[in-house]
Amino acid sequence: GTVYVFLLLLAFGIFTDISNACSEQMDDEDSYEVEKRGNACIEVCLQHTGNPAECDKPCDK
């Protein structure tokens, strides 16, 4: 019985590690996407206004 519980905990621990690693990677990709979008927004905004200060607010910087 004890060995079974141990294996169960071990498997659960490995699964948790894997899912944590995956979700961390997803978070990184999400923030990278947001960063890219923000930069693109500022570039477009600058083309229209030429004023970086005006671009910070609408682009969430």
UniProtKB/Swiss-Prot annotation:
MF terms (GO), sorted A to Z:
potassium channel regulator activity; toxin activity
Signal peptide region: 1-21
GO cellular component, alphabetical, reads: extracellular region
Q: Secreted as a keyword?
A: yes
Which keywords are on file for this protein?
Answer: Cleavage on pair of basic residues, Disulfide bond, Ion channel impairing toxin, Neurotoxin, Potassium channel impairing toxin, Secreted, Signal, Toxin, Voltage-gated potassium channel impairing toxin
State the compartments where it is located: Secreted
Could you name the domain of life of the organism this protein comes from? Eukaryota
Q: In which tissues is it expressed?
A: Expressed by the venom gland.
Membrane spanning residue stretches:
none
Has UniProt tagged this entry with the keyword Signal?
yes
Which residues are part of the propeptide segment? 22-35
Residue pairs linked by disulfide bridges in the UniProt entry: C41-C59, C45-C55
Family membership noted in the UniProt record: Belongs to the short scorpion toxin superfamily. Potassium channel inhibitor kappa-KTx family. Kappa-KTx 2 subfamily.
What this protein is reported to do is described as: Voltage-gated potassium channel inhibitor (Kv) that acts on Kv1.3/KCNA3 and Kv7.1/KCNQ1. 1 uM of the toxin inhibits Kv1.3/KCNA3 currents by 35.1%, whereas 10 uM of the toxin inhibits Kv7.1/KCNQ1 currents by 44.9%.
Domain note: Has the structural arrangement of two alpha-helices stabilized by disulfide bonds (CSalpha/alpha 2(S-S)).
Miscellaneous comment as given in the Swiss-Prot or TrEMBL entry? Negative results: does not show activity on ion channels KCa2.3/KCNN3, TRPV1, and KCa1.1/KCNMA1.
What protein name does the entry list? Potassium channel toxin kappa-KTx 2.8
Q: What is the lineage of its organism?
A: Eukaryota, Metazoa, Ecdysozoa, Arthropoda, Chelicerata
